A protein has these predicted regions:
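Histidine-centered catalytic/metal-binding microenvironments
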Residues: 411-454
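Short, solvent-exposed loop/beta-turn-alpha elements that line the ligand-binding surface or hinge
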Residues: 35-54, 97, 153-171, 244-253, ...
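Extracytoplasmic/periplasmic substrate-binding proteins
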Residues: 131-139, 144-154, 181-342
Length: 454
């Protein structure tokens, strides 16, 4: 709506972050933003260009019309698979062994509940959001349960026949829901998850009543750092289990739609269009990767978990495998197999924070979070060698799932998990999903995929 008004009034800021490729195209068609092709070639560092190249051609192509680049796209690095975070101190307290399989881990969660690890009769099981699927930027989803079943819900994917299908309507998703239902019936999944809001689960972590969550590598930053601030003896440890199945699921071809992507554009006629190229190069190359004392303050902010949205432009530009590169270098420096002088500015900041934490000089939650996320969690992902398949671009189609179908899906998932509906109700849900617009939407996405191959 804001873009509509801006186009109608022909009034936009000199530099603007635009959400969605559709809005970007409208600004281009209205002739309101600068062609940044020359700016990109002449004012962007080689390192930034390498970063964009690491995603293949599709990312920059999404900001290109008639051979002209009109925006600097945001990049989304490979975040790896979700991990299971368990209270290791509880495992030791109950005299249990650390898990090597998903089944062993779930039995540990059962023991947390049945033996009341919290000690006051209020221990809950595995936390679960009513959104069920957290994706790469939310908390408390049970995404791993789907990954372990070979499912990719909430994504457009290619099936084994090479056809487009919405991942939430596959038999693998049904299998995952069946397993979650069993966990709920067995008391392993939080029995009151339907009533929980995010802040309620946050509080259960802080008060020491929850000892199991699924989360990405950054879970120590959010939500676990808040719990650590209250009780530094709560030892949360990440586990990546059933690695072979996780690796197979991560290889599924997933489509990437640019409907929700962020793009930085420059107003047509602005005297200094090069400012975006210089900003991106300064923040994401020279500050992050050069070991430059002048950039130390910026990098120190990141290493102690300062919200990156405090940047002037809320985007990120980095290598697709930046997460693994950074941790590999920090770990090597900690092991003394890499000289600290060879670390980038950002890596040096994390190295200093992690070293201070290990030496006992930095005992804050931010110090723990830096080490637990960058070294322990990413280290688990690195050891497994699991990488996500490169996404397939999805252009010239609105692939977003309508609100009606989103609600139908979420309600069906919750009803099946909680036992309100039988597992076979999933088949009814699939029929309804296709009948209420899913069939036409799937055909549109299939056609867009086919035309994009030509």
């Amino acid at each position: 709506e804001a873009v509509n008004v801006a186009i109608e009034d022909r009034d936009i800021p000199d530099v603007l972050v635009v959400k969605g490729r559709d809005n970007l195209l409208r600004l281009i068609e209205a002739g309101m933003i600068e062609d940044l092709t020359e700016t990109y070639e002449e004012c962007t560092t080689d390192t930034i260009k390498e970063m964009y190249d690491s995603y293949g051609d599709s990312l920059l192509q999404s900001a290109t019309v008639d051979g002209k680049l009109y925006a600097f796209p945001n990049t989304v690095i490979d975040d790896g698979a979700p991990l299971l975070w368990l209270r290791k101190d509880w495992i030791e307290k109950l005299g249990l062994k650390e898990p090597e399989t998903v089944e062993e881990a779930l039995e540990i969660v059962r023991a947390f509940v049945e033996q009341d690890a919290a000690g006051d009769g209020q221990t809950i099981g595995l936390a679960c959001s009513t959104d069920v699927i957290a994706g790469a930027d939310q908390t408390y989803g049970v995404d791993s349960a789907f990954i372990h079943a070979g499912a990719m819900p909430c994504h457009w994917i290619l099936d084994e026949s090479g056809d487009v299908v919405y991942g939430s309507v596959t038999q693998e998703t049904k299998e995952a829901l069946s397993k979650l239902r069993n966990l709920y019936e067995d008391g392993i999944l939080d029995q009151r998850f339907l009533l929980r809001k995010t802040e309620n689960i946050d509080n259960l972590l802080k008060t020491g009543h929850c000892g199991a969550i699924y989360g990405r590598w950054w879970a120590p930053n959010n939500p676990l750092s808040a719990a650590y601030s209250v009780d530094s003896n709560a030892e949360w440890k990440p586990y990546l289990l059933d690695k072979e199945q996780v690796n197979e699921t991560q290889k599924i071809s997933v489509f990437e739609s640019y409907d929700q992507w962020m793009y930085v554009v420059v107003r047509k006629g602005y005297e200094h269009p090069e400012i975006v190229a210089k900003y991106v190069s300064a923040i994401f190359d020279q500050s992050r990767y050069a070991n430059d004392a002048s950039a130390r303050e910026v990098n120190d902010y990141f290493s102690i978990n300062v919200d990156p949205t405090a940047r002037p432009l809320n985007i990120n530009v980095d290598y697709e495998d930046a997460l693994y590169r950074t941790t590999e270098h920090i770990q090597a420096a900690l092991d003394k197999t890499l000289d600290v002088s060879e670390l980038s500015g950002l890596e040096k900041s994390y190295y200093d924070t992690c070293k201070s934490f290990l030496n006992g000089q930095l005992t804050t939650a931010n110090g723990w979070a830096a080490y637990a996320s960058r070294i322990e969690a990413v280290g688990e992902l690195q050891k497994a060698g699991i990488r996500s398949a490169q996404t397939l671009p999805l252009e010239n189609v609105n692939a977003e799932i309508p609100q009606e179908l989103q609600e139908l899906e979420n309600e069906a998932f919750l009803q099946i998990i909680s036992g309100e509906k039988p597992v076979d109700y999933f088949d009814t849900f699939v029929v309804e999903w296709y009948a209420n617009g899913g069939k036409e939407l799937t055909e549109q996405v299939q056609n867009a995929y086919e035309s994009g191959k030509d």
